[in-house]
């Protein structure tokens, strides 16, 4: 029979491993979730970056999804409602020509403005993402 401390350590390790597996499976790519498939066009996808052309009509909702560290350039003005995994919501406004940095994030978004939102999003991958941490 194993010593209780070894059993506890094994259980702890299994729990942590399960958490990471679940976290990875819950983090969905924006191009695969409801609303994202129709609104996100991949322009470039290589080992370093993925560049997305995003167009969201008024009222468009994008289901919960994740991004690695990224930069967003707003081609048009934008008014979003952002929902985090814990259910908290906030509104964000951006103006055409504005660029924003974001660390890795999981959220759902909705265009709550009156105009189509057009933005270009550059997601960092590989060494670029590691350097951003």
Where are these regions (language model features)?
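Histidine-centered metal-chelating micro-motifs
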Residues: 59-62, 96-110
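Bacterial N-terminal signal peptides
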Residues: 10-23
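A short glycine-rich, His/Asp/Glu-containing loop-to-beta-strand
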Residues: 36-61, 68-72, 121-122
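N-terminal secretory signal peptides that target proteins for export/translocation
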Residues: 1-5
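Short acidic-glycine-tyrosine-enriched beta hairpin
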Residues: 45, 86-104
